[in-house]
Design a protein with these regions (language model features):
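A structural signal for short, well-ordered beta-strand segments
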Residues: 109-111, 151, 163-165, 176-180, ...
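Short, conserved beta-strand/beta-arch hydrophobic-aromatic motifs that form part
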Residues: 74-82, 160-180
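Well-ordered alpha/beta subsegment
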Residues: 132-141, 203-227
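N-terminal lobe of the biotin/lipoate ligase/transferase fold
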Residues: 2, 16-20, 26-160, 209
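Short, acidic (Asp/Glu-rich) active-site segment that either coordinates a divalent metal cofactor
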Residues: 102, 172-200
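Intrinsically disordered, low-complexity repeat regions of secreted/extracellular protein precursors
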Residues: 4-11
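Acyl/amide activation-and-transfer machinery of modular secondary-metabolite enzymes
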Residues: 106-111, 196-204
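Short, conserved charged micro-motifs
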Residues: 120-122, 174, 187, 211-215
C-alpha cells in the first residue's frame, strides 16, 4: 500500500531521522526514503544540508512524495501561474526552470551532490539524470527521449519526468520528478515548465502496474550507477 512507510510530516526536525531502515547504504551516494512530506520543510533542509557540507560530506539522494503543490523556478514568469484557483499552494523556489506540479503518486528524488568531487558539469548531470529515467522506461518497453530545448523526459511528446537543479559552491540540490500514478488534472491549470499546451503522461497510463516503491528503487539504482 502506497501509504505504508511514509514519514511523519512536520517542521523543525531532521526529516531523515526515524526508522533506521529508511537509510539504505550504498557505496555512493546514500539514499533516504522520506515518505510523504510537505514541500517547504524538505526544501529548507536541502539548503541547510548543502550549506553545511564540506569536502568529505557523503552525497545523498532523497526520495519523497509531496502533497499537492506548484513550485516556481527562477525562470518562472507571471503568466506561468495557475490559470484557475484550485486551492493548490504555489511556492517560489530557487531551483532552475519554470513551473511544475508535485503531488501524491509522483516519485521525487532530490540529488544532493558534490559536483566538483564527481567532476560533473551541470549539463552533464542533467543528461545523466535524463538517461537514468530513459533506461528505467526502456525496462518497461517504453520508448522515451530527452529534448535539447527543454530538460526532462518525454514519451511520444508528452512529459513524464521533470528536472530542476540549484548549484551552490559546486554542490547541487533539487532534482527530478517522475509521474507514476497520480491525478494529472492540476497540470492542466499551468503550462508545464513554461510550454503552452505541453501534454503530460504517467506510467500507469502507459500500462506499468508495479508499485511506486518498486519503481522508485529501480530508478534509484539507475541514478546511483549513472552519477
Amino acid at each position: 500500500m502506497r501509504g505504508e512507510g511514509r514519514g511523519e510530516r512536520g517542521e523543525g526536525k531532521d526529516l531523515r531521522q526515524g526508522d533506521p531502515s529508511s537509510l539504505v547504504p550504498r557505496p555512493s551516494p546514500l539514499f533516504h526514503r522520506l515518505g510523504l512530506q510537505d514541500y517547504e520543510p524538505v526544501w529548507r533542509q536541502m539548503k541547510e544540508f548543502t550549506a553545511a557540507r564540506n569536502a568529505v560530506t557523503p552525497d545523498e539522494l532523497w526520495q519523497v512524495e509531496h502533497p499537492p503543490v506548484y513550485t516556481l523556478g527562477v525562470a518562472a514568469k507571471a503568466e506561468h501561474l495557475p490559470r484557475v484557483n484550485n486551492g493548490i499552494p504555489v511556492v517560489k523556489t530557487d531551483r532552475g526552470g519554470q513551473i511544475t506540479y508535485h503531488g501524491p503518486g509522483q516519485i521525487v528524488i532530490y540529488t544532493l551532490l558534490d559536483l566538483r568531487r564527481r567532476n560533473l558539469g551541470v549539463r552533464t548531470l542533467v543528461r545523466r539524470l535524463e538517461r537514468a529515467v530513459i533506461e528505467l522506461l526502456q525496462g518497461y518497453r517504453i520508448d522515451a527521449n530527452g529534448r535539447e530545448d527543454a530538460p526532462g523526459v518525454y514519451v511520444a511528446g508528452a512529459k513524464i519526468a521533470a528536472l530542476g537543479l540549484r548549484v551552490r559552491n559546486g554542490c547541487c540540490y533539487h532534482g527530478l520528478s517522475l509521474n507514476v500514478d497520480m491525478d494529472l488534472t492540476p497540470f492542466s491549470a499551468i503550462n508545464p515548465c513554461g510550454f503552452p499546451g505541453l501534454e503530460v503522461t504517467q506510467l500507469r497510463d502507459l500500462g506499468v502496474q508495479d508499485p511506486i516503491e518498486a519503481i522508485a528503487e529501480k530508478l534509484l539504482d539507475r541514478l546511483a550507477a549513472g552519477i
